[in-house]
């Protein structure tokens, strides 16, 4: 099912190639492993094509560390735009723009380079593999907005609807290719 609640060929393809891993990374979590989906050329083409339709009009695509990089780069290529890697804290040399956010147990940081890239006025779509609670995507949107960028939407391959990630991102439009 998509974010519109409809079964599509892309949603069915995602469902058929998503590996369910129980109790990972901790007990009670049902991890969605999209590696088989990304490794299948036809599926990757279908997924990036669908995400590119949601990202049209952007002049930059931002992917979140790390699986978001895989999809964002392919979407940017389709749209003939650049791609920006939003990194986990401590992975980039200074200076950086950073945004801290809370996790279930602790906190984390996202970073982008502070030099060499002018994001003021850029229309950016943020891409990631999975939307769960929305904390990471919300932090990415705040980070980009602080640099003067206009975040136009977020797009994900897989949404865990019961975790309420859309609410954390409101009023930002969120597009998911499949929702469970």
From Swiss-Prot:
EC number(s) for this protein?
2.4.2.7
What are its GO cellular component terms? cytoplasm
This protein's superkingdom? Bacteria
Pathway membership, UniProt: Purine metabolism; AMP biosynthesis via salvage pathway; AMP from adenine: step 1/1
Q: Which reaction does it catalyse?
A: AMP + diphosphate = 5-phospho-alpha-D-ribose 1-diphosphate + adenine
User: Keyword Transferase: yes or no?
Assistant: yes
InterPro entries xrefs: Ade_phspho_trans (IPR005764), PRibTrfase_dom (IPR000836), PRTase-like (IPR029057), UPRTase/APRTase (IPR050054)
Q: Which UniProt keywords apply?
A: Cytoplasm, Glycosyltransferase, Purine salvage, Transferase
Gene Ontology biological process:
adenine salvage; AMP salvage; purine ribonucleoside salvage
HAMAP family, per the entry: Aden_phosphoribosyltr
Entry protein name? Adenine phosphoribosyltransferase
Q: Which organism is it from?
A: Mycolicibacterium paratuberculosis (strain ATCC BAA-968 / K-10) (Mycobacterium paratuberculosis)
């Amino acid at each position: 099912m998509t974010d519109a609640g409809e079964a599509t060929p892309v949603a069915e393809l995602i469902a058929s190639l998503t590996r369910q891993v129980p109790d990972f990374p901790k007990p009670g979590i049902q991890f969605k492993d999209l590696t088989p989906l990304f490794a299948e050329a036809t599926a990757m083409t279908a997924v990036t094509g669908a995400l590119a339709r949601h990202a049209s009009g952007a002049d930059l695509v931002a992917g979140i560390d790390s699986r978001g990089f895989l999809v964002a780069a392919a979407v940017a290529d389709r749209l003939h735009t650049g791609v920006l890697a939003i990194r986990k804290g401590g992975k980039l040399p200074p200076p950086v723009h950073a945004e801290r956010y809370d996790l279930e147990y602790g906190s984390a940081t996202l970073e982008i380079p502070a030099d060499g890239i002018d994001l003021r006025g850029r229309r950016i779509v943020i891409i990631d593999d999975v939307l769960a609670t929305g904390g990471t995507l919300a932090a990415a949107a705040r980070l980009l907005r602080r640099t003067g960028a206009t975040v136009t939407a977020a797009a994900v391959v897989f949404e865990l609807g019961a975790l309420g990630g859309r609410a954390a991102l409101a009023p930002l439009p969120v597009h998911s290719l499949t929702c469970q």
